[in-house]
Amino acid sequence: ASPEVMVRCEKGRLQLSPIAGTRRRGRDDLEDARLAEELRSDPKEQAEHVMLVDLGRNDLGRVAQPGSVNLERCMDVERFSHVMHLTSRVTARLAPGRDALDVLAATFPTGTVSGAPKVRAMEIIRSLEGRARRPYAGCIGWLGLDKDSVDLDMGIAIRSMWSREGHLFWQAGGGIVHDSDAALEWKEVCNKSAIMRLVLEEGDDHVPAHR
């Protein structure tokens, strides 16, 4: 599975790691390399990823020291058991006088599960989805209690399974942009949830774990 870092702060160093752009893993190394290159060169995936990186930089900028926001890496292909993603890393230095709650307020919800512009995107999501997401796309993590150091590590509640009243459930989704294709978005959702189906011995043969 590939849970995403929502925001991390260690001794005043902030980090976001946007994930946007997905392909399944290949059945062998040759297919895996082909799918990685397809992902890396897809204009739709590139545009979506750059938009979310910019949003992440803006979010960190709200609580960062002026001039400290830095894009450490951009659009690397990162491989997981069933899928590969385009990933980036944005860092910054926390501004004096800011605390962990300021960091959470500036970054939650992350743009990769809300969209941009963030407030308007959330309004559209609420009108279209018709029900609460509950834990899905929220955040899970910890906040340090040291008054002399701001430390936190929050992950996005995706690729996660929940138990309620004896029932297991999970959710998966994809970012919808102007150039999205409904069939491809559905395939992405299936690929993202493959690990959950495999855990429950319901894995599909066409989405194998890469070995």
Question: Where do the language-model regions lie?
Answer:
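Extended alpha-helical targeting/anchoring segments
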Residues: 1-211
